[in-house]
Amino acid sequence: MLFRSDKKTGKTVWKKDRPEKPYQPLTVIGRKAYVTPLIMNVKGRDLLISNGAAVCNAYDPETGEEIWSLTGGAESTIAMPFTEKGIVYYYTGFMVDPAGTDYSDLMAINPEGKGDITATNVLWKKRSGRLQLLTPVIKDGLIYTVDSNNNMMCIEATTGKEVWTTRMRSNFNASPVVAAGNIYFFSVRGDVVVIKPGREMQIVNQFQIQNPVWATPAFLRNSIILRTDRYLCKIN
């Protein structure tokens, strides 16, 4: 279910049941999504983009009317949809191929249209290791992300082509952050990797903070505020 509440009174403005049919074959845990919706303006109209395990939907945030849907994915997902230059990007829920390998698709879609846009509005999709945890970032037309196989990747936002990939030492579940002209990544083993955006992989700095990081950090002026499994830390 999706619903809108009045922020001053807490009263429900509208409620909308999400589609049930695409989720019927899935396990109970597989039907779940932990995704923060995205609101974007498309040709003068606001759309609320909400991707789930098996379907991505767009709604009118004023009324709750479903504008379009796009089917794809098979299990739970977490990453938030994101946008650049009028294109919506999101991870599907993870799937399993005939060989038993987990994977997800990174989707790029045209958010214009109405109804079922599965066959018409996909600009590109890129298969990779399970990609449903962290939300990628876009900088100067390039997408930066890390998959569940520890592959840090740079991808062209317009084509989906891989620009470079580098195998890292551990998993990255916190979302990367663009700050001070660089991109910061935080791993589950406490690695902090700072890279320079661009078509070549260039590490500016890296260090370890001893404790795992799962939550996306906040940046305050010249400091990083982050939560590990044991501490709330401020790093200058």
Regions from the PLM with identified roles:
Residues 1-2:
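Short, small-residue-biased leader/transition segments that mark boundaries at the very start
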Residues 87-88, 190-191, 197, 211-236:
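Blade-level signature of beta-propeller repeat domains, shared across WD40, Kelch, NHL, RCC1
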Residues 106-117, 157, 194-200, 236:
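Short loop/turn segments immediately following beta-strands, especially the blade-tip
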Residues 96-97, 126-197:
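Loop/turn-rich, solvent-exposed surfaces of beta-rich toroidal or solenoidal domains
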Residues 9-13, 63-68, 113-122, 159-163, ...:
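Beta-strand initiation motifs
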Residues 15-45, 51, 69-84, 90-103, ...:
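Extracytoplasmic beta-rich repeat domains
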